[in-house]
């Protein structure tokens, strides 16, 4: 899982080739340049490709992290985690 510009590192390692991805809105063009074989999704808060997940920015990373909690532990665990954090999920 990458958050914000962490996707640029994944791009340089060619781990995003053939996948959809996102990053911070100010780095979308750089992501396209570094990973021409990825489909950049500029309006997505996060993209879950199964084994690789990319999140657009810091607050999107919170939504993405709660998504991972939900994927691994279920919806109830993600809801309880968000409530504990006093975070309103997108």
What spans do the regions from the language model cover?
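Active-site-adjacent pocket-lining segments in enzyme domains
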Residues: 1-90
């Amino acid at each position: 899982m990458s958050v914000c510009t962490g996707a640029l590192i994944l791009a340089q390692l060619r781990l995003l080739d053939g996948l959809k991805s996102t990053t911070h809105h100010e780095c979308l063009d750089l992501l396209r340049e570094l990973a021409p074989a990825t489909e950049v999704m500029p309006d997505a808060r996060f993209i879950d490709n199964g084994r690789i997940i990319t999140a657009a920015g810091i607050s999107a990373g919170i939504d993405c992290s709660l998504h991972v909690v939900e994927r691994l532990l279920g919806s109830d665990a993600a809801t309880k985690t968000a409530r504990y954090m006093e975070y309103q999920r997108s």
